[in-house]
Amino acid sequence: MTESTFPQYPRLVLSKGREKSLLRRHPWVFSGAVSRLEGKANLGETIDIVDHQGKWLARGAWSPASQIRARVWTFDKAESIDIAFFTRRLRQAQQWRDWLAKKDGLDSYRLIAGESDGLPGVTIDRFGHFLVLQLLSAGAEYQRAALISALQTCYPDCAIYDRSDVAVRKKEGMALTQGPVTGELPPALLPIEEYGMKLLVDIQGGHKTGYYLDQRDSRLATRRYVENQRVLNCFSYTGGFAVSALMGGCRQVVSVDTSQDALDIARQNVELNQLDLSKAEFVRDDVFKLLRAYREHGEKFDVIIMDPPKFVENKSQLMGACRGYKDINMLAIQLLNPGGILLTFSCSGLMTSDLFQKIIADAAIDAGRDVQFIEQFRQAADHPVIATYPEGLYLKGFACRVM
């Protein structure tokens, strides 16, 4: 398509001097950078973004109710946002996942990681021959039909299931959606394989898309620390860390979660891998409360895995989240035997690695223990971070030796 045959998109005009982030190819335009919208645009509709003098900068999606007024689809003026566009993006992303899946023997991985794969607001996880779709932005929802058509072209043998039932959609004025899109319904529990483990995934009712693929490498790394050790697995969900700890030869692993359904699946995962169920304990409880009870009763562990849900959704919550992370890590440090290992994580995008490391250091001081940082973690390689969007590095973690 030549430029002369392009549709005339509405134009989002930026205030003077507010184009710098787009010139650096950051994919978001915040409300404070906007001067005006020329023309009419529906929620999620494609718009052109220009500087205060009318110079073209990018093409994106309009979201008037969000602090992120526009999310960029492309920095190429000659690129139209259509089925062919989504097909190109999918095939580009698949090249890396094909190599990774073959290299690591994976049957499940993140196929599309939003902005880092050039598709802002789009998350797609692949579990076997099921594609699980999450559309998190107005632009992604507006392009639903084109995206699904591209998926059917690229993956004709895969079923597509929608898990766009996340609260963040409400911020952009969208309803929550869930259900089959094409093909068969996923089974209640779908078995996948990960580094020698067999794990059951609840696509329809589980957290997010059903399973935390981003922690794959951290689960594998756990095995080097747990041989003949007593392990506490906090916020255990369906037991991926527990199964990995048992495969690493731990003496005992105690998994704690507030969801009985998740703990039941964790138990099934231990059995599915033919591991010694007598070494696995499953506790339904609040982690903060249980850690305090363990401290009062003098319980001790050799390894503690701390993988909490996101504590912070926006900048106004950051200080409170810092206190929460410090308190829970302080409790964990107090429960570790000398020489014990704390594997601790944060999946909050607003929590930088440097800030998280400082929080762990402060927690150690409050616990009256010395801590050595011995290993650093991040999301698995199927969750890439494009250089112009550092916010994409949301998962960070540390292995700490507690003296």
From Swiss-Prot:
PUA domain location: 9-88
Location of the protein in the cell: Cytoplasm
One Pfam family it belongs to: Methyltrans_SAM
Catalysed reactions listed for this entry: cytidine(1962) in 23S rRNA + S-adenosyl-L-methionine = 5-methylcytidine(1962) in 23S rRNA + S-adenosyl-L-homocysteine + H(+)
MF annotations from Gene Ontology: RNA binding; rRNA (cytosine) methyltransferase activity
Top-level taxon of origin: Bacteria
Broad EC category: transferase
TM region positions: none
Predominant location: cytoplasm
Keyword list, A-Z: Cytoplasm, Methyltransferase, RNA-binding, rRNA processing, S-adenosyl-L-methionine, Transferase
GO cellular component: cytoplasm
EC number of the protein: 2.1.1.191
Family (UniProt): Belongs to the methyltransferase superfamily. RlmI family.
Stated role: Specifically methylates the cytosine at position 1962 (m5C1962) of 23S rRNA.
Record's protein name: Ribosomal RNA large subunit methyltransferase I
Organism: Salmonella choleraesuis (strain SC-B67)
